Amino acid sequence: MMSYLKQPPYAVNGLSLTTSGMDLLHPSVGYPATPRKQRRERTTFTRAQLDVLEALFAKTRYPDIFMREEVALKINLPESRVQVWFKNRRAKCRQQQQQQQNGGQNKVRPAKKKSSPAREVSSESGTSGQFTPPSSTSVPTIASSSAPVSIWSPASISPLSDPLSTSSSCMQRSYPMTYTQASGYSQGYAGSTSYFGGMDCGSYLTPMHHQLPGPGATLSPMGTNAVTSHLNQSPASLSTQGYGASSLGFNSTTDCLDYKDQTASWKLNFNADCLDYKDQTSSWKFQVL
């Protein structure tokens, strides 16, 4: 600023102005002679001054102006310094209290963390205990075939009749027929007219012919020759095998049933994964629901 004022007079609108003219044009602008220090010097307190300040802080944390002036006279410091010291001292006290609280919480937290694994173990054991009864009850159901589990049967079929009450329907496909274990896997289909009467079996039987196009997609381990030979059998031969063609209303042109020969044994594995059939050559897979 001083160098700016020491410049020679310059013309403003053709008038030669001096520094006094600048003061007249800008009377509100002050030009300090010495630059102001932006940072104050740190105040170093002596031991005696700190003792006096600590004694007053022990009495009250918020002294009024009169108390601050009195202490400032005692320790020979400005009152503003005393006010700033009390402000810093209160902040330091709050910080110490927070550290103590955090330290107490840190001491209590490990105990909670130690007790939490026990709770997790107990919760895991509780969940395992909750899940074990369904698994134990589901295996005997499949093994003993005490009750039908109609997950693959159509939803519109009425409840099973008495001859089919002991059949395991986990192997049922899209047609309403069940495999009975009592006959020693002979597949004696009970063709009762009371159960199959008035039903259109074509809607349930025809899709199976398209789903079993090749030898890889057949569910039974017998070959394709046996399949074609059984598909071309007459109703008389179907009735001799215990299928009840007369009561079911099947004719000789129905080529969508996957039957077996009496000489060929189609053994059913009633295990926990009896619904998981995976053929390498077909994409028709049953998954456990």
Curated annotation (Swiss-Prot):
One GO CC annotation: cytoplasm
SMART domains reported for this sequence: HOX (SM00389)
GO molecular function: cis-regulatory region sequence-specific DNA binding; DNA-binding transcription factor activity; DNA-binding transcription factor activity, RNA polymerase II-specific
One BP term from GO: inner ear morphogenesis
Region (Disordered): 93-143
Matches recorded under PANTHER family: HOMEOBOX PROTEIN, HOMEOBOX PROTEIN OTX2
CDD domains referenced in this protein's UniProt entry, alphabetically: homeodomain
Tagged with keyword Secreted: no
Described function: Transcription factor probably involved in the development of the brain and the sense organs. Can bind to the bicoid/BCD target sequence (BTS): 5'-TCTAATCCC-3'.
Low complexity: bias regions: 95-106, 133-143
InterPro entries the record matches: HD, Homeobox_CS, Homeodomain-like_sf, Otx2_TF, Otx_TF, Otx_TF_C
Expression (tissue specificity): Brain: restricted regions of the developing rostral brain including the presumptive cerebral cortex and olfactory bulbs; expressed in the developing olfactory, auricolar and ocular systems, including the covering of the optic nerve.
Entry protein name: Homeobox protein OTX2
Binding region for DNA: 38-97
UniProt keyword list: Developmental protein, DNA-binding, Homeobox, Nucleus
Family: Belongs to the paired homeobox family. Bicoid subfamily.
Compositionally skewed regions (Polar residues) per UniProt: 123-132
Lineage: Eukaryota, Metazoa, Chordata, Craniata, Vertebrata
Result of changing residue 225 to S: Has a dominant negative effect on the proximal promoter region of HESX1 gene; represses reporter expression
Organism expressing this protein natively: Mus musculus
Major subcellular site: nucleus
Record localization: Nucleus
